[in-house]
């Protein structure tokens, strides 16, 4: 049994004094090409004036804000929304992605900045024209839908039916014809957020045919045709986005620190504007999701390394030294505590010396089901000053603001040796069960310098209409440090997960509840966590014969009695597979699911199937639910993504 599958904790190499080994190449102290000709005062002026990274433009932030806002709104309406809620969502969608005369411009400019490539004028002009047309037809459709919903049933007639059918058909066909303009050969990656947003709107539109089609006068054959089209396009759009996201990411792999920063920014920003969105596409199928859906995104995103200087050329760590040691796929956990270690960094003049964050331990806990606290290996260099402990105990850290400082030593003739350090971090945290906000601070207490990092700049809130503790989009769940070249300091990197994650795996009494299997707290035998294929909202579980897992679910808080749920599992398998469902210590049901893919195939959207187990489950109080996998041959593989609980009326 492997209770935690925290394999990344086994890959960190430590020195005899328990410090992370610095086994990358050492750069000469004065070998900083962009700085060595500067005198000390000129360097200080340059670093003060140039302390904001070039890619943090207002356009990029605008695109990220739009992407996060759309996901936040969608999470509130996925499933089977009716009437006013749907029209209100569409109105917000129009105001978010199509507010002016240049629709989705921010998304195009975002990727141009990320991969340092421009979209050719002919392709951009055609895409922009198509987007303007889509905006117009969708706006007309939403206006007609609003009028339809507000018209009493007794006043709806054949003319009003014909009018809304006409506008729906115009909008749907316009989207279908326009999509190739956002997949122009050679520009697939550059157009990817634009493609994803257009695809999302098209699939939402097709969903409406299933909700309203009968009232609009469509025949059963028409509705079946629309539904088939929706399912086929969900596959096409999802696979396109996952494929070209990966192609763009692979192209950005490099060897230097600066290349890793760009690589990670692409990964983070494309997750926020593309991958999070396509994760929700299956939920638009209202024949499958006949109720509202409570779902969550368990994927990790990393904010930029925290440094006190913009230009790290020559003394940043290497691409591989960061990428090889960030967290590998893991069971979901939440932040319990951080132990901060500090050291003194002498300054050239003495008075410019400062204390800095030199290393840390991280303690985490599984989402629910186990009281075990898992302590990480030590990251960085052990403290020569007092250790500081901050405990969060599951409260959601929604913002981190860091201060930093620099020590610059002249070397040789005109050269410089730069030391960078994080000197103070203020963590804002929210207890959603008590509706309480508080802050905790790591403080090195000596020359803390100015603010060099605010997580909100890279992970903005869902909306600016509410206070930040209610509107935040992400919560901190891991921290680790990396050594700069030549012992020049430490760069911390924060890992965040989406606000939608429910630590308690709480079932909804009215909605369908999706729980990713990475929310389990026990893995059995050869069960392992592997990276998701890009459209699952996080990592997934890989099983072989005889493997399994256990997760804990919490009953709906509004229930004082038991509730019965149908169970579905989203899975991919290279052979027929037997799923066993256990409640506590007894076997509740055995189900056999079909093969979905061939051995050796890459996981795509159509590799997965959603199948129901043979018996419903009655939930009363907290329940441990075991899932076992069997009946497959040697070399066969089973991947499980989510379990769904569908309340029975």
UniProtKB/Swiss-Prot annotation:
Residues 14-25 have a biased composition (Polar residues). GO terms for molecular function: signaling receptor binding; toxin activity. Pfam families: Endotoxin_C, Endotoxin_M, Endotoxin_N. Residues 1-13 have a biased composition (Basic and acidic residues). Residues 1-29 are annotated as: Disordered. Keywords: Sporulation, Toxin, Virulence. Belongs to the delta endotoxin family. This is Pesticidal crystal protein Cry3Ca. It comes from Bacillus thuringiensis subsp. kurstaki. The lineage of its organism: Bacteria, Bacillati, Bacillota, Bacilli, Bacillales.
